[in-house]
């Protein structure tokens, strides 16, 4: 089936992910559950058909863009799959952006319409006059009626009621662009990556089924949000590919809200980013199974998982975390640990169906133990960036995608993250990975999170500087900084210890949880002026 759908032919992803499940008798099964509502496969099919019919009546044609500014509720899959079914390009938008950032994404994408959660509608309505391409605002959720009363705004439910649910799916093809995902902007302005219909099933089969072993009996919960490539696969394409069920959390994940979902829905598979695993481990209520007596596997991506964190989780919760790496450009995870073969501190090995290699700045392939840029190839690679020709040519080179991440491969074939290309720096003439120092820092009992950059000392020599967030209840005394430096020397090496340590309440992160080290470098540069 995978080989077939990757051929250029008539194909719409909604057929495989929704209609096929209804056809095999799963119509009454819950596909999605949020705190207030559930959505069965039959309801998902009927309502996405209605929304797909409504979009052309609003003037949206195939390949027009529809922005989705939605919390993780049942409205997200309805809007996303309705757009896909209609051949309209869905563009999920990070719900944590500022009004200026919303304006940037909406202007850059030239979205003809937006579906927005009522609680997020105010900033969109305030900037609407600056967006000539944005013809329609569609509001969902509690408060939608109040927003619609302002004029020029549609209620999502009103659009659905006005349409029949007679079968309808646009005549798209497998190689046609189905949706865009904006990169998280860990190194600057976000870029829109274009993805095709066939890529969704490719990732579901290779990672979801091939590595995680997801089946129709699984209930999944992803703390990573649906607007994030990682979350889109975790909570939507993976479970829908087999007729599974998904628990959704609209709010930002905290240990309290996550554990509440775990207790209520008892998921079998849990996905998160390393910083959330660290916060959960620091929470007093974390226990065996993390609230779910059915939990069989946990998954991490977004940033590298420190080895000590994975080992503590396994000891406390009784379930391994499969750490891996993916990207918006590749849509999902392409390197991963796997059940029964977990090596903490590594990103695992290539997911079958993907190839990976490490190259130097001239594109020459490097051997084991050598640090270079990770490049990958596989069936889910994006079609390039929207309106970013030069960056597309640098990233998507023939069959290979350049990740911008520094890695090394050990003699056993496991890949180890060393940092972003921009984040690496030399100390005493040797390349230093900020992640290695950060992993040593968070293994200290007082430190919850850490970020490391290179900073010039008084002689103009680059040395490591650390920014740390302390665990609740820890107050540094005069010995703290020397103890931490000694701890890092013992864990990472005597030349890698941070010469300066700043304590912060939090670290700058993207909406998907990645540390923005470039912002810390900018802060230091401003101080030196």
Where are these regions (language model features)?
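AMP-binding/adenylate-forming catalytic core of the ANL superfamily
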Residues: 97, 114-116, 263, 270, ...
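Conserved AMP-binding/adenylation subdomain of ANL enzymes
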Residues: 201-222, 227-268, 283
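Gly/Ser/Thr-rich phosphate-binding loop
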Residues: 267-272, 282-343, 355
């Amino acid at each position: 089936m995978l080989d077939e759908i990757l051929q250029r032919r008539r194909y719409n992803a909604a057929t495989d992910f929704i209609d096929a499940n209804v056809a095999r008798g799963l119509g009454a099964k819950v596909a999605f559950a949020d705190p207030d509502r559930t959505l069965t496969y039959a309801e998902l099919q009927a309502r996405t058909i209605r929304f797909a019919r409504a979009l052309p009546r609003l003037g949206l044609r195939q390949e027009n863009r529809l922005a989705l500014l939605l919390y993780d509720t049942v409205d997200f899959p309805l809007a996303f799959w309705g757009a896909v079914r209609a051949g309209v390009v869905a563009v999920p938008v990070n719900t944590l952006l500022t009004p200026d950032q919303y304006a940037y994404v909406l202007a850059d994408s030239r979205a003809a319409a937006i579906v927005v959660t009522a609680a997020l509608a105010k900033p969109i309505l305030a900037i609407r006059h600056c967006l000539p391409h944005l013809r329609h605002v569609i509001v969902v959720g509690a408060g939608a009626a109040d927003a619609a009363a302002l004029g020029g705004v549609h209620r999502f439910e009103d659009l659905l009621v006005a349409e029949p649910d007679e079968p309808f799916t646009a005549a798209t093809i497998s190689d046609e662009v189905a949706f865009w995902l904006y990169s998280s902007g860990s190194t600057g302005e976000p870029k829109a990556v274009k993805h095709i219909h066939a890529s969704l099933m490719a990732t579901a089969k290779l990672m979801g089924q091939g590595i995680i072993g997801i089946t129709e009996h699984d209930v999944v919960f992803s703390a990573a949000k649906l607007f994030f490539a990682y979350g889109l696969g975790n909570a939507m394409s993976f479970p829908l590919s087999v007729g599974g069920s998904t628990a959704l959390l609209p709010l930002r994940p905290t240990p309290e809200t996550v554990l509440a979902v775990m207790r209520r829905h008892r998921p079998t598979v849990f996905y998160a980013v390393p910083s959330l695993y660290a916060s959960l481990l620091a929470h007093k209520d974390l226990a065996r199974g993390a609230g779910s007596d059915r939990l069989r596997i946990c998954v991490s991506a977004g940033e590298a998982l420190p080895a000590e964190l994975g080992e503590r989780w396994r000891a406390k919760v009784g379930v391994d975390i499969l750490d891996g790496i993916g990207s918006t450009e590749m849509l999902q995870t392409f390197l991963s640990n796997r059940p029964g073969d977990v090596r903490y501190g590594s990103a695992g090995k290539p997911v079958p169906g993907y190839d990976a290699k490490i190259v130097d700045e001239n594109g020459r392939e490097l051997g084991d133990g050598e640090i270079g840029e990770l490049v990958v190839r596989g069936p889910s690679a994006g079609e390039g960036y929207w309106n970013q020709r030069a960056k597309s040519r640098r990233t998507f080179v023939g069959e290979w995608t350049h990740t911008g991440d520094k890695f090394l491969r050990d003699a056993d074939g496991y890949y180890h993250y060393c940092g972003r290309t921009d984040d690496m720096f030399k100390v005493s003439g040797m390349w230093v990975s900020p992640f290695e120092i950060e992993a040593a820092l968070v293994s200290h009992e007082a430190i919850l999170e850490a970020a490391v950059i290179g900073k010039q000392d008084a002689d103009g020599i680059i040395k490591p500087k650390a920014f740390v967030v302390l665990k609740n209840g820890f107050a540094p005394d005069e010995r703290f900084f020397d103890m931490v430096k000694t701890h890092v020397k013992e864990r990472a090496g005597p030349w890698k210890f941070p010469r300066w340590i700043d304590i912060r309440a939090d670290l700058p992160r993207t909406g998907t949880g990645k540390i923005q080290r470039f912002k810390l470098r900018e802060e230091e540069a401003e101080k030196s002026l």
